[in-house]
Amino acid sequence: GFFPDVGATHFLSRLDDIGVYLALTGEQISSSDALYLDLIDYHVPSDKLEALQQALINEPNLSKQNIEHIVACFITRPAESELKPLADGIRKHFGFQHVDEIEHSLVQEQDEQLRPWAEKMLSILQQRSSIAKQTSLKLQHLGRGLSLAQCMQLERDLQDIWFDHGDFIEG
């Protein structure tokens, strides 16, 4: 088990309960979800990235206005966020201060539409290392009050300790 790093303490903590959900479960998000969460400003399909890069390389004057114009030519609207319909359920269950409260809340889910999702999330959490879950949750709470530089340093310091004494699986 490990914890989200590479600045995740900073950017996930700004997503409140949804950030806690992502940190604890390790669920991946799509570009649609990233747009919904305001983690990105634009969606450019991966098959258009090379053309965007070439357009930027070919532009002799990379002013802010020209860059915005070039990027605008490649922006598309992705599919609807899969995370958006789960947001209320995520807030309901992942807003607690302790992992055991989150897990208990998921067990107690009565909404028939949310129950399969809650059971899946509980199963994921129960497979995770206890120390990794507790650490990830604590980092999300601490990160809300720290700068990016402070979060990066905290993650670095914790990594050093983790590799020496943590619950880290090599492979």
Model regions and ranges:
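Generic secretory/membrane-interface signal
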Residues: 10-15, 24, 62, 149
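CoA-thioester-processing core
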Residues: 1-19, 35-37, 52-56
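Glycine-rich beta-to-alpha active-site loop
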Residues: 1-4, 21-31, 42
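C-terminal alpha-helix plus adjacent terminal tail
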Residues: 29-32, 47-171
